[in-house]
A protein has these predicted regions:
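Acidic/histidine-rich catalytic neighborhood of metal-dependent amide-processing enzymes
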Residues: 1-51
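Metal-dependent amide/peptide-bond hydrolase catalytic core
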Residues: 53-171
């Protein structure tokens, strides 16, 4: 018998379904081949994966009067710039003798969406990003730095114009 699973890259939904079906049929496995690009090396460690969506809520308005609104896309871009700065710091924090390639914690932006038209101040924006830590401390470091940046710089700046502005991070 051969069995194959699906959805490895996102939620691994196929593996639990396969396990349930094998149990129901009382089929015991004797071999497992994992289709990862390892060149047949045994892998005994894996980077972590933290996935985030950060939501920015500002104040819409007409594009001809930007001072009367809070542009969520502009604040999201400042947030992304901070993440990119942190990415550079992470490269310098690589542990000695790291077995990973690259040998340091990685951070990347997977998507950004916001606004409804060129002439409308965007009151909403969301940023999807991920962190692949080599060590737990890097995850703690990035979250502390970005949360502090939001709390002490971005949000107060937004709330000067519109007190109901908010920035919310989903994990």
């Amino acid at each position: 018998h051969f069995s194959f699973t699906f959805d490895e890259e996102t939620a691994c939904q196929g593996a639990p379904l396969l396990i349930d079906e094998l149990k129901k049929r009382n089929i015991k496995d004797s071999l497992c081949i994992v289709g990862e690009p390892t060149n047949m090396k045994i892998i005994d460690a894996h980077k972590g994966c933290y996935e985030y969506t950060t939501h920015f809520h500002g104040l819409a308005g007409h594009g001809s009067q930007p001072e009367k609104g809070v542009n969520a896309v502009e604040y999201a871009s400042k947030f992304i710039q901070k993440l990119m700065q942190l990415r550079e710091v992470l490269k310098k924090r690589k542990p000695k003798n790291s077995v990973f390639n690259p040998p340091y914690t990685t951070l990347q932006i997977g998507g950004i969406s916001g606004g409804i038209a060129r002439n409308v101040i965007a009151d909403r924006c969301k940023v999807d990003w991920e962190l692949r830590p080599v060590v737990k401390e890097d995850g703690i470091f990035v979250n502390k730095e970005i949360d502090e940046f939001v709390k002490k710089e971005l949000l107060p700046e937004m709330q000067k114009v519109y007190p109901k502005s908010e920035i919310r991070k989903e994990v």
